[in-house]
């Protein structure tokens, strides 16, 4: 309920202020495990992807974002923390659990925002989680 409310609010704001145009939603399967793998340019990328997707989306987010109050809001909206700089087994397991339950996990495979707009080297986590959960991977571009 809260997720849908926040998603619809962002959809209105993005449509009015950013003139958000979404293409390719027909490529998002209606059910089953799904990884949305996207480039990452801005702090607005997670709400843009969540708004554009036709299903509820869970996000891995750097653990530094999970400060009091804000971290609780992120968790209510389906995000979970990941420790960057190495293999965070708990976060990887949580991502696989989300996928194995037939849900959607959005990942920014580069692990950080691009400062130049160029694609960086992808980390192996997205492919590994999708493979273990037998999830479909849908690429996204913002």
Can you say where each PLM-predicted feature lies in the sequence?
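Soluble catalytic domains of membrane acyltransferases
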Residues: 7, 14-142
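Helix-enriched interaction subdomains in cytosolic or periplasmic regions
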Residues: 1-6
């Amino acid at each position: 309920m809260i997720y849908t409310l926040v998603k619809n609010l962002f959809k209105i704001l993005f449509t009015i202020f950013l003139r958000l145009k979404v293409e390719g939603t027909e490529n998002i399967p209606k059910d089953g495990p799904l990884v949305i793998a996207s480039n990452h340019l801005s702090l607005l990328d997670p709400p843009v992807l969540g708004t554009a997707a036709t299903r509820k989306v869970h996000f891995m987010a750097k653990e530094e974002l999970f400060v009091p109050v804000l971290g609780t809001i992120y968790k209510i909206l389906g995000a979970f923390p990941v420790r960057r700089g190495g293999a965070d087994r708990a976060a990887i397991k949580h991502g696989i659990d989300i996928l194995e339950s037939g849900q959607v996990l959005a990942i920014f495979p580069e692990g950080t925002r691009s400062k130049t707009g160029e694609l960086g080297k992808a980390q192996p986590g997205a492919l590994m989680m999708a493979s273990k959960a037998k999830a479909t991977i849908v690429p996204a571009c913002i």
